[in-house]
Amino acid sequence: MYLGIHVSSSGGIQNSITNGEKYGVNSIQIMPTAPMRWATKLITDEQIDIFLDTLERSSIKKILIHGIYLTNLAREDKQLFHLGKMGLVVYLDFAERVAKGIKERKIDSEILGVCFHPGSQKELSYEDSLERISYGMQWVLDEVKGNQKLLIETTAGTGGNLGRN
């Protein structure tokens, strides 16, 4: 059985692993960067090596990466739409590289993918918002080749939030 928790990665992404272990769980959900800042720079190989070193010595088996909270792929604003896509590219790239490191090092752990809130309907119609989200997701998947999943987190659907069904 797997039991997990969303943990902080403050002070370095490797801290998410030790924070999860403090709670006695074997699965964690993490945000590799600050949740309320645009993630536009790829996570370095050195950061990933430190993360893998920590993971190798841990009891964490499952890791889900959560996208930043600023992502709204339903936005019509081209700059905000692009920043949202790039944040997902950064996280999906991180997931791919960590999964590769897990395989190479034969670590008994797994990256489950990147989940994110799809966004809120603001400027566009409901149908156009869904089309925009679909286009944004496909763009991200085309940018980052690999096997990691891009997962939409369901929402309550309040305030124009999309992803409720």
What are these regions (language model features)?
Residues M1-G67, T71, D77-V90:
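N-terminal pre-domain/capping segments
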Residues R57, L73-N165:
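Active-site acidic/histidine proton-transfer and metal-coordination neighborhood
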